[in-house]
Amino acid sequence: MDTPTPQSRLDTLAAAYWEAYLETYPLFATSVGDRRYDDRLADPSDAGVAGARARFAALQDEADSLGADALGAVPLDEADAPGGPDRPGGAPELDAAARVTLDALRESVSADIAQLDAGLLAWNIDPIEGVPVDFLNVPDYQRLQSPADGHHMVARWCAMAAYTDEHLASLRRSLADGRVACRAPADRTTAILAEILGTPTEDWPLLAPLAGLDALPGWSPVERERFAAALWAAVNDEIRPAFARLHDALVTEILPAARPAERPGMCHVEGGLEGYRGLIRVHTSLDLDAGELHRIGLDEIARIDSELGELAGRTLGTRSLEDALAALRGDPALYFTTRDETYEKAASSLARATDAIPAWFGRLPEAPCEIVRMGPHEEVHSTIAYYRQPAPDGSRPGQYYLNTSSPRTKPRYEAEALAYHESIPGHHLQIAIGQELPHLPEFRRHLGPTAFFEGWGLYAERLADEMGLYTGDLDRIGVLSFDAWRAARLVVDTGMHALGWPRDRAIAFMHAHTALAPDNIANEIDRYIVLPGQALAYKTGQLEMLRLRTEARVALGAGFDIRDFHDTLLGSGALALPALRGIVSAWVEHRTPGSASTPSS
């Protein structure tokens, strides 16, 4: 038997990692169109988490072994940038493109392990991505076409009850060990549970698939009747009681012992500070400490405050940041009045961006983007917007989910920047392009560091101004407010989780430096409490992308082409920031007069 080549080993390993990831996270598998796990959920038990970690650790060991063999024992993060000369003493048997894949795989597996080691699953109560909201959104993307799909759906719905009970058991075990969630976001989850439990079962989102059942071909009357009865029983007899048990336990057991608003951060949980350090690496893809990120945030806030003062002087008649923010928050004319207005503004912004992108990007996605209003079960306690990737098989477009609740609290001047971040040229453009790169292994089409995804979204907000997409100076004030918002995240996330800030101090900092509405600020701070480190990705990624663009423009001069630069940034999938720098450096070198190298991905 022939000895496997490094390339064949890498191909096998990349496929094995993708399979392990889909099996570990079945809801993600469904969201990207893989239907094999539509009947199950992730295993949140201690044994399930340990099993997932063991799978990822075995893959990490294999990737490290391959790296040592293929790169002549040169650690991958010390190897030359793609397209550059080989290191002395290390004769790589993987070409530059394959080395990027190996680097990405090691980065991704390491992040998976760090996420599990942080231990959040055991004690965290997440009103944004946890029970029950995560489950209530599943009908939006789980397919129901055939009777077999119906069997899978019923099985998964029943698994939701078991998952909820296991989640409660974990919360109780953690409470006994002295690890407990922060009160403020836990209150939000309790309110969401109370709201859904107060809703008649027939109106639950989990029964929405029944509305279109009669129109589905290939079902006999008996199959329709059995499925409808089984789905109803799963929701009414399994999930509803499980949600009620969780709600009651939160009220009587967890909330009375929850950490107060004075101690919201991971640093107040045993082992939390170490876990937070790991999450910084996960979300930024860089070896930065909390203090350094905190300082970067403060520096960015100072710069943006100055820019905002100058623009406010021209637009609002005051250069005082405090007065400008008060004017932005206090003028009802600057806010929407109806839900439809909020939606229509997003739609018109998306349409303008769609028309403009061919001048700025050579590669465009085939998948379209649509705007979807958040459902009532999530909008009150959710963020202002989020994005869901398209189904790779074309059955679902990319979706920009918009929170249209309480329109009088939603500023008009922020709506355009929000749309460009979530849709085009932001998340939709980047994620849809990544999914449509046929030369990449599956995991690179769908996974990647938060710093790349969110860094691109924030980069896109500023790019939209260069593209001429903003209507006026008030909308540009919205851009600066959003930029300050992301810079403030560096300050408040590290402030709470590493430096011990109370929740009120984080809220006050956001209020002093952004034009965000008070309700939005409170929602955001509670989001950072339950998703530690995630908020660090935005500014970290944006700043690196801006640096790369500036360096490339200086190096290439008149030879710099913005379309080629953007195609280079997005043409290799979502990469760790050091790997992205290597890709851009190779592209610049290839275009430098006299260079014989070629770019790679």
Language-model features: locations:
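N-terminal maturation segment of proteins
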Residues: 1-601
